UniProtKB/Swiss-Prot annotation:
Biological source species: Homo sapiens
Annotated segments matching region II: 23-90
Region feature V (Cys-rich), mapped onto this chain: 179-264
Family classification: Belongs to the neurexophilin family.
Protein name: Neurexophilin-2
Length: 264
C-alpha cells in the first residue's frame, strides 16, 4: 500500500484568519506566563481583555490562585463572605431546630414557683416575708409549700382555708384547720418546721436604744386532694403594735407570668 501526498490548497483569507488567531493566542499565552513574574499593571489588563476564558470563571468570580496586591485580597475576602453567607443560610434552620425546646408531658407538673405568692409585711418592730408555691402531682393531689422569714416580735400564721372562711380577728390564731373543714376541704398539713433565733440589735424607731429581736424561719407543706374548686391562703399576723388578717384566693387554673404580690 502506497501513501500518496495530498495537495496543499491555500486560501488567502483563511490563512490570514488562522494567522491572526494564532497571534492572539500566543499573545494571551505570553500574558499568562508573565503572570508568574509579578509584573505590576499589565497583568490585570491581559487577563480581563483576553479571549481565553478560564473554565473556573464559569463558577467562581476570580481565579483560585491567590495573587499579591490589594485587588487579590479584596476578591478573596468577597468570595469568603459569599461562602460564609451560603453556609449560614443552610445552618440557620438546623440551629433553630436544635434550639427548639422539647416539651415533656410527664406525670409531675409544676404549676407555680416560689415567687407566685409573695407577701411582705413591714412594721416598726417587725419585717415579715412570706413566699409560696404549688405543685400538682398529677395523681389527684397537689402540695402547697410556704416559707416564712420574719425579724422582730410578733406571731404569724399562714394556712389554707375554703372560700367560705370569714376574715376576722381571732383571740388565739391557729395554724391548722378545724376538723369539719378539714374533711370537706380535703387539705391537711403534711410537714411543718420552725427555726427560731434570738438576738439584740439597734431599734428601728430609735437607734440609740437596743431592742430584742427574734428571727423565725418556718417551712409548711400542705397536701390537698380532689375534689376541690378554689383554695384560699389565710394570713394572720399579730404583734404588739400591729394586727393583720388577710385572705387571698388565687385562681390556680390561670397560669400567669406575673406573680401575685401583696404588701402591707
Amino acid at each position: 500500500m502506497r501513501l500518496r501526498p495530498l495537495p496543499l490548497v491555500v486560501v488567502p483569507g483563511l490563512l490570514q484568519l488562522l494567522f491572526c488567531d494564532s497571534k492572539e493566542v500566543v499573545h494571551a499565552t505570553e500574558g499568562l506566563d508573565w503572570e508568574d513574574k509579578d509584573a505590576p499593571g499589565t497583568l490585570v489588563g491581559n487577563v480581563v481583555h483576553s479571549r481565553i476564558i478560564s473554565p473556573l470563571r464559569l463558577f467562581v468570580k476570580q481565579s483560585p490562585v491567590p495573587k499579591p496586591g490589594p485587588m487579590a485580597y479584596a476578591d478573596s475576602m468577597e468570595n469568603f463572605w459569599d461562602w460564609l453567607a451560603n453556609i449560614t443560610e443552610i445552618q440557620e434552620p438546623l440551629a433553630r431546630t436544635k434550639r427548639r425546646p422539647i416539651v415533656k408531658t410527664g406525670k409531675f407538673k409544676k404549676m407555680f414557683g416560689w415567687g407566685d405568692f409573695h407577701s411582705n409585711i413591714k412594721t416598726v418592730k417587725l419585717n415579715l416575708l412570706i413566699t409560696g408555691k404549688i405543685v400538682d402531682h398529677g395523681n389527684g393531689t397537689f402540695s402547697v409549700y410556704f416559707r416564712h422569714n420574719s425579724t422582730g416580735l410578733g406571731n404569724v400564721s399562714v394556712s389554707l382555708v375554703p372560700p367560705s372562711k370569714v376574715v376576722e380577728f381571732e383571740v388565739s390564731p391557729q395554724s391548722t384547720l378545724e376538723t369539719k373543714e378539714s374533711k370537706s376541704f380535703n387539705c391537711r398539713i403534711e410537714y411543718e418546721k420552725t427555726d427560731r433565733a434570738k438576738k439584740t440589735a439597734l431599734c428601728n424607731f430609735d437607734p440609740s436604744k437596743i431592742c430584742y429581736q427574734e428571727q423565725t424561719q418556718s417551712h409548711v407543706s400542705w397536701l390537698c386532694s380532689k375534689p376541690f374548686k378554689v383554695i384560699c391562703i389565710y394570713i394572720a399576723f399579730y404583734s404588739v403594735d400591729y394586727k393583720l388578717v388577710q385572705k387571698v384566693c388565687p385562681d390556680y387554673n390561670y397560669h400567669s407570668e406575673t406573680p401575685y404580690l401583696s404588701s402591707g
